[in-house]
Regions:
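Extracytosolic helix-loop segments that constitute the early lumenal/periplasmic catalytic or substrate-binding loops
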Residues: 5-15, 19-53, 62
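Loop-to-helix entry region of an early transmembrane alpha helix in multi-pass inner-membrane enzymes
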Residues: 51-57, 61-68, 73-91
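Transmembrane-helix signature of polytopic, membrane-embedded enzymes
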Residues: 96-118, 135
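Membrane-interface transmembrane helices that cradle and orient dolichyl/undecaprenyl
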Residues: 101-104, 140-156, 166
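Short acidic/glycine- and proline-prone juxtamembrane loop motifs at membrane-interface regions
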Residues: 125-133
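Perimembrane helix-loop-helix junctions
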Residues: 146-151, 175-201
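Membrane-interface alpha helices of multi-pass inner-membrane proteins
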Residues: 155-170, 177-182, 200-202
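Membrane-lumen/periplasm interface segments of specific transmembrane helices
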Residues: 189-225
Length: 225
């Protein structure tokens, strides 16, 4: 710390918040390249893999989109992953409070749950994008509560959009299609079913394209030793 201050810098100028994995550096460099040059350059991933067309290794480029947007607007530096994740979650919590309007007791309970959920704080303070999708989860939950109180077509569309985008980034989000699809069918009957089916098919199609062109599987899974 003293050495960096000697040269007029702070530790934040030379330190990338990281956890136990090497993902953080790879994510950071991919976003840096996209923000500055329009496309990730080089070979990335645990085994330096490359997709058929684009160099995103085992990670879907959809994961990086919120950070890319942040980098284009505010710039991209070593602390940008943490700062942006904190801001995204602050915005999500503010929207949640504004649309759900929880009581003081409910607010304390909700914030208490977040406080004791260690992975939430941990991902906020490292270079992993999971905190962004936790923010989407908070927003999704708030919109779901609003829809349960008063079904609205715009809210339903927002819910589908969140699940579609998040599924492209983290496939486990696909489970939430069942929740939103149920909303659609309950309100619009067969039209809701068609809407949900279209959303699922579109997401699967885009994900298949990403998997074939942008990403590559782990090398060790195809090598026998």
């Amino acid at each position: 710390m003293i050495y960096t201050l000697k040269d007029g810098h702070t530790p934040l100028d030379v330190f990338l918040p990281a956890s136990y994995w090497n993902d953080e550096l790879m994510y950071y460099k991919q976003v840096e390249n996209i923000v500055s040059g329009g496309l990730s350059k080089g070979w990335f991933g645990y085994n330096e893999m490359h997709g058929n067309i684009y160099p995103f290794a085992v990670w879907s480029p959809a994961i990086l989109l919120p950070w890319i947007l942040w980098g284009k607007i505010f710039g991209w530096n070593l602390v940008a992953p943490v700062v942006s994740s904190i801001v995204f979650n602050m915005v999500a919590l503010a929207i949640f409070a504004g649309i759900v309007k929880p009581s003081v007791k409910e607010s304390v309970f909700f914030l208490g749950l977040l406080a004791v959920f260690v992975p939430y704080t941990r991902y906020l303070l490292c270079g992993m994008p999971e905190a962004i999708y936790m923010a989407l989860g908070i927003l999704f939950m708030g919109l779901s509560i609003c829809y349960c109180r008063k079904p609205d077509r715009k809210i339903l569309i927002f819910l589908f959009a969140i699940v579609m985008f998040a599924t492209l980034a983290r496939p486990y989000w696909g489970l939430f299609f069942l929740w939103v699809w149920w909303f659609a069918v309950r309100k619009y009957n067969w039209r809701g079913f068609i809407l949900g089916l279209f959303a699922v098919i579109a997401t699967v199609g885009i994900y298949a394209w990403i998997s074939q062109t942008c990403t590559a599987p782990y090398l060790e899974e195809s090598v026998q030793t």
